[in-house]
Swiss-Prot record:
Compartments in which it is found: Cell membrane
A GO biological process held by the record: proton motive force-driven plasma membrane ATP synthesis
Family annotation (InterPro entries): ATP-synt_VA_C, ATP-synth_a_Xtn, ATP_synth_asu-like_sf, ATP_synth_asu_arc, ATPase_a/bsu_AS, ATPase_F1/V1/A1_a/bsu_N, ATPase_F1/V1/A1_a/bsu_N_sf, ATPase_F1/V1/A1_a/bsu_nucl-bd
EC code: 7.1.2.2
Official protein name in the record: A-type ATP synthase subunit A
Assembly with partners or alone: Has multiple subunits with at least A(3), B(3), C, D, E, F, H, I and proteolipid K(x).
Keywords associated with the record: ATP synthesis, ATP-binding, Cell membrane, Hydrogen ion transport, Ion transport, Membrane, Nucleotide-binding, Translocase, Transport
Function of the protein: Component of the A-type ATP synthase that produces ATP from ADP in the presence of a proton gradient across the membrane. The A chain is the catalytic subunit.
Amino acid sequence: MVVGKIIKISGPVVVAEGMKGSQMYEVVKVGNEGLTGEIIQLTENEAIIQVYEETAGIKPGEGVTGTGAPLSVELGPGMLKAMYDGIQRPLNAIEDATNSIYIPRGVNVPSLPRDVKWDFVPSVNVGDEVLAGDIIGTVQETASIVHKILIPVGINGKIKEIKSGSFTVEETVAVVETEKGDKLVTMMQKWPVRKPRPSKVKLPPVIPLLTGQRVEDTFFGLAKGGASAIPGPFGSGKTVTQHQLAKWSDVDVVVYIGCGERGNEMTEVIEEFPHLDDIKTGNKLMDRTVLIANTSNMPVAAREASVYTGITIAEYFRDQGLGVLLTADSTSRWAEAMREISGRLEEMPGEEGYPAYLSSKLAQFYERAGRVDCLGSEDRQGFVCIVGAVSPPGGDFSEPVTSNTLRIVKVFWALDANLARRRHFPAINWLTSYSLYINDIAGWWKKNTGEDWRVLRDEAMGLLQKEAELQEIVQLVGPDALPDRERVILEIARILREDFLQQDAYHEVDSYCSPKKQYNMLKVIMTFYKKALDAVAKGADPAKLSAVSVKGDIARMKYMPEEEFIKTKVPEMIKKMESELGALIK
């Protein structure tokens, strides 16, 4: 064990001498209070340490003790419903242990509860051959999630002993006979946060991640195992969009990282989620959620740790064959922490003062998303989707964090402050957003909704783009100067914007929209477009289109229950539009 001495302190950065024999990214205990830190730079005898706790009051001459291990997380039953800080310290347990609403410095509480007993049900027998990643048993962790206990990476052999009953996470549940002797398996594993967890093979992202949000699913779809960025200026709805994703996404587990954002936003999640029902299981949303709270007033160095802690927890659930959504709000705050520490290290600054390695750090994080064949002898697939919010100052998408993120992710949901001011939510700008997964996921949509899904989607997108081109002319000379066909396009584009793209996050029906309902809503609007064009071509007055009563039905369809809408309302509306538009023809 290396024991050094502090010689310099600069905010969260501490320099210690006498650290020969230490390793990069080794966790150290700093000062008399034993603050947690991580070595980020080594010279022959000196180590530069980023400290994950407040450094006020520590002084040169105090000791620095190496632990010999990298920054790691504890993985096992007890993570769901938990709330951690950036280095996986359980906030509720710290409050109980210290009887304080603040985190005392140097506090050391285990990440997983050591006194809770979990009912372990074995799924293998003595004598069975097992590989790393094999499931040896299960624990019913919450009402929603059955936690699968895996053979740790690096252990292959034969089951020598397997137990059944109630155990804590530290008690042995299995003994595996390997070539290097017997290995004891507990329900808890430790894993270094900076090292991606291995898998057999990465699979192509061809299944859409259904979010229930029409603009995201239909127009800018994200695939399971994909990565997406949500950049937007302040007040444009990044956090509400991420809350909606956490509530409604077609995943088994949600890891929500509050990385340097306001404490009130984390409070909102903690207060809302225990009362909300999960659409898939009918249980509470909190039962499938892991919260990592690293708010703006916490030490900046821990922002980087919180991102890596979150993705490692997500990969662990992925290895069980589950689907995981990781939302990070906001990666800009992590980048700002990197900039601050880089400045204190006196490194050469890159663009706008960010370190030169900004893009490689972002890439390391986003590249850990993916749909994989999990380790183990059986065929098991899991995925991690990453949705990172970006907060560009002044909504400038050309700044380094946004531009580097866009090089890495394939889905870009651009939030627009102008749309938010017009009360258009979700405020995702359909002209600047894009998804590069559309060709990959189109097959799923065609198979599960309708063969013409891609045609309808592309036509609708074309109408919205055409409307943007016509707006300049309309502002100069008014809509009456346009040809009849283009007046129809303006009317249908308005219907698409107001009745399809807008969605009420607080309405019990409209908050979530299924793929079939999305497809049928789009089909109704595009059928109205084609029939309106026919009517106008046969002499109908385009000004009278806005007076037909079927338009009111179209405006109300998002509030209709799905079954009633698809079975009865869609045929009724198509029949009604035929008769009403037919009556307009002279």
